[in-house]
C-alpha cells in the first residue's frame, strides 16, 4: 500500500477512507472523473491541427490533469486490491484461530505464496506449536528442535497434529544391554 502511494500519489488521495467499501467508492468516483477529463480532452483537441494543439496552454493543462487522474486511479486500484487480499487472508486466519488451531501467520503466508506459484522449497521455522493444516500437505518444513532444523515432509495423516511432534528434541540411543552390567559387576 505504501509503495503504491509513494509511486502514484499521496495520503491526501485516500481522504481518511480506510475500509474496503469506502476505498472502492473512491476508486469509482476517480474513474468517473478520469472519464470526464478524457471526454473534455477529446472535445478540446477535436478539429485542431497537431501544430496548433501543441501551443495551446489550456490543452496542456488538461493533459496534465488527465495524467494525474490516471496515476491516482492506478494507485487506488493497487491499494484496493491489496486491502481486499489482506481482508480475505485475515478472515481465513481468524476463522482458523476460532477453531483453536494455532498456525504461525508468517509460516502460513509463506506456504500460501508457494501454493499460488507452485513452488516446493524447504521452509524453515521455529514454530513447533503450529498446527498442521491441509494447505501444508506436500510441503517440506524444516522444524527447529533446539539444535538443528529437522526436515519434515507433510502428509495427509499429519493434519491436525503439531509440527513439533515430528521433530524430536532428544535422541534416544536405546537402553544399555544387561550383559554389559553383569560383566562390570564380576
From Swiss-Prot:
One of its GO terms (biological process) is translation. It comes from Aquifex aeolicus (strain VF5). Keywords: Ribonucleoprotein, Ribosomal protein, RNA-binding, rRNA-binding. One of its GO terms (cellular component) is cytoplasm. Residues 96-186 are annotated as: Small ribosomal subunit protein uS19. The keyword tRNA-binding does not apply. Protein S19 forms a complex with S13 that binds strongly to the 16S ribosomal RNA. This is Small ribosomal subunit protein uS19. GO terms for molecular function: rRNA binding; structural constituent of ribosome. Gene3D superfamilies: 30s Ribosomal Protein S19, Chain A (3.30.860.10). Residues 1-95 are annotated as: Unknown. Pfam families: Ribosomal_S19. Belongs to the universal ribosomal protein uS19 family.
